[in-house]
């Protein structure tokens, strides 16, 4: 797991660092042109002051006709450190939880709760799209088939004498010899 996380973090740092041209050092020690320009050291001498392009090529800052050195930006550095801490913590938590579940499954400690373990019975659920909406469908008298077998007549509540065939005895009848 960490084998995937470390290259991903490295790629993130590389992409972020390539934006300002400082590489990975720009992530840990970002430079900025923000702040008061008068208390900074001049950069490039008179030629850089006369040519703003030369000033910027020297990776200096140019504002109001003054070419000056960049300063480390502590606010951006703090934000980068927090991003790095949260990313590493998330990767560590993910790795540990995967290892914990793998260990628990190998030791057969991980069990599904009882209400989730059984098969899914969809007959009790009500579908909003179904036409019947959970009502029990009972056959009407017109839709009952005419020829029913003996078992189905007994189940449907037929009387005791109705289901007998010729040659069978019922409890209340006696055979005449």
Swiss-Prot record:
Q: Where are the transmembrane segments?
A: 82-102
Cite the record's Acidic residues compositional bias ranges: 157-177
Q: Which domain of life is it from?
A: Eukaryota
What is this entry's stated membrane topology?
Answer: Single-pass type I membrane protein
Question: What are the UniProt keywords, alphabetically?
Answer: Disulfide bond, Membrane, Signal, Transmembrane, Transmembrane helix
List all topological domains (Extracellular): 22-81
The record's Gene Ontology cellular component field reads: inner acrosomal membrane; nucleus
- This protein's major location comes to membrane
Residue ranges of the region described as Disordered: 131-177
Check the record and name the InterPro entries matching this protein: P_trefoil_dom_sf, TMEM190
As for subcellular location, the record says: Membrane
- Name this protein carries in UniProt: Transmembrane protein 190
Q: What is the lineage of its organism?
A: Eukaryota, Metazoa, Chordata, Craniata, Vertebrata
């Amino acid at each position: 797991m960490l084998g995937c996380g470390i290259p991903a973090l490295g790629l993130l740092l590389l992409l972020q660092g390539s934006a300002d041209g400082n590489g990975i050092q720009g992530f840990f020690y970002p430079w900025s042109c923000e702040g008061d320009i008068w208390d900074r050291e001049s950069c490039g001498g008179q030629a850089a002051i006369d040519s703003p392009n030369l000033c910027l090529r020297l990776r200096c800052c140019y504002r109001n006709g003054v070419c000056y050195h960049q300063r480390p930006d502590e606010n951006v550095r703090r934000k980068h450190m927090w991003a790095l801490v949260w990313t590493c913590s998330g990767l560590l938590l993910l790795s540990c939880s995967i290892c914990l579940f793998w260990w628990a499954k190998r030791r057969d400690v991980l069990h599904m709760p009882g209400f989730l373990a059984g098969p899914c019975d969809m007959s009790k659920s009500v579908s909003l799209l179904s036409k019947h909406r959970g009502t029990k469908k009972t056959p009407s008298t017109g839709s009952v088939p005419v020829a029913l077998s003996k078992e189905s007549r007994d189940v449907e509540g037929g009387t005791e004498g109705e289901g007998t065939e010729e040659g069978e005895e019922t409890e209340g009848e006696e055979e005449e010899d």
